[in-house]
Amino acid sequence: MSWLLKKWQNFIVLAPLASLAFASLSGALFSASVWWALGLLGLALLLSRPDWKWRMLVVCLVVCVAWRTEVIESRVGKSHGQSGSEFVEGTLTLGRVDAVFESQRSGRLEMNSGEVRKVMVMRASEYRAGEILEVRGKLFSPGILRNPDEFSMLDYWKNKSIERGLSIVVAESRGLRWQSAPVRWAERLKLRLQEGVSAGLENDLVGQSVIQAMVLGEKPPADSEISVAFRESGAMHVFAVSGLHVTLVGAIAWMVLMNLPVPRRVGVVVVLLAMVSYAMVTGARPPAVRATLMATCFLGAFVLRRRPSLFNALALSFVLAVIWDPTQVKQIGFQLSYGVLMAIGAGVGVAYRFTGKFAEVDSFFPLRLLDVWQQRWLAVRRYFAALGATSIVAWLGSFPFMLWHFGIVTPISVLASLALIPLTTVILGLAFAGSFLGVFWPELGMLSNRLNGAIARTAYYTADGFASVPMGHWKARRGSGTDWVVFDPADGGAASYLDVGGGVMIDVGSEKFYRYTLRSILRKWGAEVSMLALSHPDGDHVGGAHLLMQQGDLRKAIIPTMKARSPSYRDFISGAEDHGCKILVGTRGKRYQLGGDVWLEVIREGLSEDRGIADNRIMVMRVHWKGWRVLLLGDLGLEDELALLEGEYDLAADVILLGRHHHGNSINMPFLKVTGAKAVITSAANYPPFEKPPQNWIQTMERNGIEIFNQTETGAVLMDFGENDLELRAFLKEEKKLILER
């Protein structure tokens, strides 16, 4: 016990600022959870020096950060609480390009009414940082989430303290702010670097993509083979610009300065300037900014002739970051940055006791007797021993965050980092060298870039190899939390996910819906879709099918017809064989097993002849789930509805899913009486008008005892199937719920 107390006292002496870090965290969380805040305040007081002045500083810091958090959150929350949009006029001062959505810029809008708003400006790539504009435009807030686990632009803006979005209608330039000159310089330099690091790599798309991502943060699409390889090898911290890259840039600068007659303190300042410049050039991404701040706090001790302390430097950077913006403590990247560095600081010494055995030398052997090559080999072993220890504790530190937020576990990343971090260092160094040489000697610059391209390809193949190692990574499948999710694309399209078998989709929505909404939802769930059924070749229903297929998990697709005019539909069919997806044209009466006691039945085949529009070629399907029947009608029209009534079709159903026919006539009361359905889920959109269910149609259905789930009001609809009951729930309206019983 006395040993533990002594360690505690030593930690307080070595890292007195740790108490202030916990105090600032307490203040940032006060509005979210009082109990967590009080617990952290108690820990801060325990870690503080036994001095009433120090403890008073802790309490004051908690109060100040809590007040600042409340001011920021209340202002942003009040602004986003305003529904709809409004036209405004005023003076707009533009900020930097957004790190994720590069066509957008932050800005400060001073409206003619006297109000001031921090805004995100849409389609602002043509403007410059610090540009002052007289504008007329539309202020708006992002729409509410209509589907479970959908990416929230509203939360993204809140985390950046953005109050509203701004679409500019008319703009007139009034000049530039001189204070923003460094940002403009960084943006121009980034454009030059993009050209410089890619010169001579026009025919090497893999090498070019890897270099652009590692050096400038210009990542390829998330579903590309390159991104998947680095993600599944646990090496995204190497692939995307992060704090690691800022650190490596500082290390490269220091290696150059070691060969020059530069005093140590001056060298440290130059290293910090290099890190700050790199962070700005890459868009001041939060991980890069945090790493630069941490490095400044740590290396600043050398400039001030003080003994550096890792924990003290981390604590100081944490306090400064939280005071600047308390809301960022809720961001995943912020938690990862400090969590990993805390783990490294606490555990790297322990880990090195094991990895350091690789670099051990007999303690009785004089090192001065080693020749040059033996000394170099020893230095290499020590480097990899230290890197291995760091990789182990970094992975352990990131493990809970990655599992909780992303549902992926990548133990192979420990080994992957040993190979990829040295390669990344070389790629960064050659990229800067190639860009510099290209200014004076273009041919030599291109030669350097081609060499770099070969190394970048090696990095990709290395990551791909580690990603292929059995049990090197696995996804903790969290699922949708419900049996059937009827998504709301809000554009008149349709998409459903059935959590059965290897995962089943019935329609996938438009390409836009899949790319910007559905893909991220499925990835968050850890869902691997192995089977797909398509109702008809309408772009709003099948537009994302070829993108889903490119994920590589799709093994079977049931389609209405082999021929259609839809380009996305044709792309899907033509690429199926290359992606290992078996195409089956739905056959009337045939049952397709989905998994367990769930199967799909084709009621009516899709029509092969072209009848003008895709809505006239519907394949009518029915899903049987534990004895419950769900009839899928797609955008069935009046003509086909009458044909089904006149034909010998079994249309019995408990629930019906339907859309709106292009000509506006979809499903009437006689048809519904034949089915015996008790609930109808209808897709909807405000535009075009025919996609919106008529109010008189809804009233007629409800008067006849049919529960309508109008997705304009409900958003997504969730269904859970039991042996004796079937529950339907609206995502947007928690109070709207229906339970069907046998």
Residue ranges with predicted function:
Residues 1-81, 165, 175, 185, ...:
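N-terminal leader/targeting segments
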Residues 2, 19, 31, 51-58, ...:
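Hydrophobic alpha-helical transmembrane segments in multi-pass membrane proteins
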Residues 2-6, 62-237, 474, 516-520, ...:
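Membrane-interface helix/helix-cap signal primarily in integral membrane proteins
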Residues 2-14, 22, 159-294, 299-300, ...:
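Aromatic-rich juxtamembrane segments at the membrane interface
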Residues 2-17, 379-382, 424, 428-430, ...:
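C-terminal regulatory/interaction regions
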Residues 219, 322-330, 463-531, 577-652, ...:
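Core dinuclear metal-dependent hydrolase active-site scaffold
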Residues 501-504, 512-564, 646-664, 676-681:
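Active-site metal-binding motif and surrounding structural segment of the metallo-beta-lactamase
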Residues 556, 643-715:
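Cap/insert and terminal regions of metallo-dependent hydrolase folds
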